[in-house]
Amino acid sequence: MVNYTLSGTALKAVFLHSDALYLSIISLLLVSFAIFFCFFSIMMTVYFTISHLQEVPRYIFFAHLLINDTIYITLGLVSFFSSAYLIYFPMPISYMIVTISSSAFKVSPYNLAVMSLERYLAICFPLRHSGWCTRQKTILTIVAVWIIGLLPNVVDFIILCFSVQSDYFSVYCLSVRSVFIKNDAQETLRFVVHSLGFSLVGLIIVFTYIKIMLVAIKLNSGKATASKAGKTVMLHAFQLLLCMMSFSYNLIEIYLRKYLYMLPMINFYFFMCLPRFISPLIYGLRDEVFFRYMKRIMLCKTPRTFPNSDST
């Protein structure tokens, strides 16, 4: 997880300069989270109410993406307020929070990669798609994605255990990643994993987009479907770019922190939370099926039978 520790000295400076500005940003953060959680709840209601959606691979992946982002944002808020208000947790709980949130951070781009591959199979191999992309295989893919996301944290934990005293896990600490960095190998591991992971995901998205658009150019029939799938993959690329914005957090804070005392908090909102707040908007509201049933739920209407649609 990207380090966003707000020191006690910086926090005091915030209050001395402007309590109103500080409270405004906190309020904006909480209101944004409330709106995001509202959309999340409506979309999950649609997903679990319409049984057919639970059999379609891309909707399963999308539901998983929403759940994963919600986990990440929630634990990120816990870590942020732990740092800002100096709230201490038992070491094992703090480490668990950091581990799950950092794994969720890695899982988001991996999920975008498999969503792009699913669209690639649907357009380029339509006859085999139903056999390759079953509900069971989709669930197994999600499990595999989480295993890949957790493996670096397992290695990190082993390195940590060899780098600290035996009583290290018996104390209370802030729930931030910097507390658990005790060896340069941990930072090296994190850099390598993020670099390779995001590069591979980027290559997969570019590859699937090119393949899908080539099909759209060659086909006279079904061109609209392939074009829609290409636009969907481009949305995944945009979501990946939003995820990568998190890496600019440390660079901006290093060079600009001395000029803006509110920078840690502003950085946390715009580069850690906001990209995931808008995820339901750039994908969920664009999907015709989700939009139709979300509107029915918000208007308190009973959903009708799900149409056999393959909108992207």
Q: Which residue stretches match the model-derived regions?
A:
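Fourth transmembrane helix
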Residues: 107-111, 129, 133-169
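Seventh transmembrane helix
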Residues: 245-312
